Design a protein with these regions (language model features):
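A generic structural signal for short beta-strands and their flanking turns/coil linkers
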Residues: 49-53, 64-66, 75-79, 94-96, ...
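Gly/Ser/Thr-rich active-site loops/lids in small-molecule metabolic enzymes
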Residues: 89-135
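Short, conserved loop/helix-junction motifs that constitute active-site signature segments
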Residues: 8-10, 116-117, 143-145
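ATP/nucleoside-binding phosphotransfer catalytic cores, i.e., glycine-rich phosphate-binding loops
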Residues: 62, 70-73, 78, 83-88, ...
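Gly/Ser-rich helix-loop-strand patches that form or flank binding pockets
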Residues: 7-19
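Catalytic core of DAGKc-family lipid kinases
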Residues: 20-94
Length: 206
């Protein structure tokens, strides 16, 4: 639903009603629909601002709430990784995942990334199946960065690679460089109707 309104985020607020277990976007489950509607009608609750990731490839911009990924299942992806214009490493493997605080509990977590507590305006980068032996080494650990950090991936060839933007994917065939950062001009506004502990939400993941 969020991606349908990416160009209108200044005019939209999101109200979450969860039909499964309690999620990170919503405070109400389907059996609490009456309470949910009462908050909605009376404009009660507290507004929370969520960061949006911005990825730029060949002049095209892509926006994600959870994560932006570079993945190559066809062959080993070799790329130079830069943080704030400083080369961190040359990575070899399947790819890299960059996530927001909210996205840290999603694909990032399954990759062994750290879960970031709510309220922390940070981004995180983690490897996807990196190759590590005596000849090739990289950080091989989650890297948590300040929200104003800029991450760049550069390669002579992204043949076979895909750019994952939350649940959407795009080809990187003609790409040489990918830039990822927090988008200062776009935020997602979510209405919180009742106080639910972050750790109670976290426990629904396991």
């Amino acid at each position: 639903a969020v991606h349908q309104f990416m160009d209108r985020l200044k005019d939209v607020r999101f109200y979450g009603l969860h039909t499964g277990t309690l999620g990170f976007y919503s405070d109400y489950q389907d059996h609490e629909v009456d309470e949910f509607l009462d908050v909605l009608i009376h404009h009660e609750g507290k507004e929370e601002i969520l960061s949006v990731l911005r990825g730029e490839v060949n002049g095209n911009c892509y926006y994600a709430l959870n994560e932006i990924r570079v993945e190559n299942a066809a062959r080993t992806q070799v790329m130079d990784v830069y943080v704030n214009d400083i080369q961190l490493e040359t990575f070899r493997g399947t790819g890299m995942c960059v996530c927001t605080q909210l996205g840290s509990t999603a694909y990032n977590r399954s990759l062994g990334g750290a879960v970031l507590q709510e309220g922390l305006d940070l981004i995180e980068m983690v490897e996807i199946a990196g190759i590590h032996h005596s000849k090739y080494r990289s950080l091989d650990a989650p890297l948590v960065l300040k929200s104003d950090s800029v991450i760049q991936f550069e390669s002579e060839s992204f043949e076979g690679a895909l750019l994952g933007v939350d649940s959407d994917v795009y080809s990187l065939e003609d790409c040489k460089k990918i830039e990822i950062k927090i988008c200062g001009a776009r935020h997602i506004r979510v209405l919180r109707g009742k106080k639910v502990s972050y750790f109670d939400r976290l426990k629904t993941l396991y």
